[in-house]
Amino acid sequence: MNYNQVNNTCFFNTLYIQYVEDIGRNEYFYYDLKYPVFYNVKNGYFQVSESILKNLNNTISSSIYDFKQGIFEEEQQINTQNPDGSKTKVNYRVYSNYDLTFNKNQVISLILSLTALDNNNPQYNDLHNYNIDLLTGNQLLLKDIFRPNVDYLKLVSDFVNFKINQNPTFYYPDASVDIPEDQSFYLTDQGIVIYFGLDEISPAANDIPKFLMEFSNFESYINPRFYCNAKNINFNRMRANNFQQFNRVYY
């Protein structure tokens, strides 16, 4: 593949994505959990290993229900410490939401938002990412999004610190980042979104800090497999299969 050109063989993954919503309540606990379940499409141009899809679905489900169970146990502990009703009971609510932000070239990028409130006061706000190579089932790391031999840690660190310095009042004084290999991120058609946890580099009231590295501005550094846009989407089965074969050799 010519590294000086945008990928011209982008194609959508042929997956069926089932929307699931689980709602329930008891006296002091309410939950509304939304999440996807992935399935192969019959006669699609490629079939993801069933074990890969099963592992992905189980991982997403476990993240949600483990979070819900932890908050439920907290509610039980708080409210059972007050059996005589001398103190006001605490109402807990748990939510999950998701976005499938990239679904092309046998790669998916999904973000899962987990939030919990007590008496309408936010207590937890976690953002999970699932960047999966559907050929191998492996979780993609930040290094995989860049071309070989790119000093991606310095590149991303410099970009994020530049953005922080553009708006310093939004962040903690002297906030500076040194991006690790396991940095949290997700993919979109537009670029790579680097993000941090609540209260990590900015006060929690500012929500989760995110930084978009647009592919168009970093084209010479980006692995073309991930650089897709409306102008290079391909629906031709033959070309998609050719890309799949090339991809297996290259990676």
Model segments located where?
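Compositionally biased intrinsically disordered regions enriched in Thr/Gly
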Residues: M1-Y251
